[in-house]
């Protein structure tokens, strides 16, 4: 069980590195990072997760991609390290910044799939739609 959690954590951190690289490249190409450039990058990452879902990738992998994209977006939008924090820490931040409530809701649903060996019946299309709605409505 502990080994499984460590492997899952390593996979999440590895994925965050990939997302960071994409955002750095996007920021370099598009100029200074603004909410709109951060939003555009997050939406591209969520589109990539949707493509993975359509290709038949496992729900666990799709949920990991959704979670990483959404946490990275929130981290950049809040100028913090939320993408490196777990769900509990993210929830504590949401108590101070209510904009994070929808992020916590989506990431919580993703974590249920990512970290439960049995997985859960999840509607990845609905989860993706909620993540996209969260990114688009961020102010």
Spans of model-derived segments:
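Hydrophobic, helix-length membrane anchors
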Residues: 1-53, 137-139
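Membrane-proximal, non-transmembrane interaction modules
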Residues: 48-51, 57-139
């Amino acid at each position: 069980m502990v080994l499984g959690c460590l492997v899952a954590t390593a996979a999440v951190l590895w994925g965050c590195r990939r997302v960071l690289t994409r955002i750095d490249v996007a920021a370099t190409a598009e100029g200074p990072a603004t909410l709109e450039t951060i939003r555009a990058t997050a939406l591209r990452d969520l589109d990539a997760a949707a493509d993975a879902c359509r290709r038949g990738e496992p729900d666990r992998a799709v949920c990991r991609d959704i979670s990483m994209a959404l946490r990275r977006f929130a981290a950049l939008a809040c100028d913090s390290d939320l993408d490196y924090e777990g769900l509990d820490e993210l929830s504590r931040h949401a108590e101070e910044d209510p904009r994070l409530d929808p992020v916590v809701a989506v990431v919580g649903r993703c974590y249920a799939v990512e970290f439960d060996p049995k997985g859960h019946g999840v509607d990845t299309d609905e989860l993706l739609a909620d993540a996209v709605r969260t990114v688009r409505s961020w102010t």
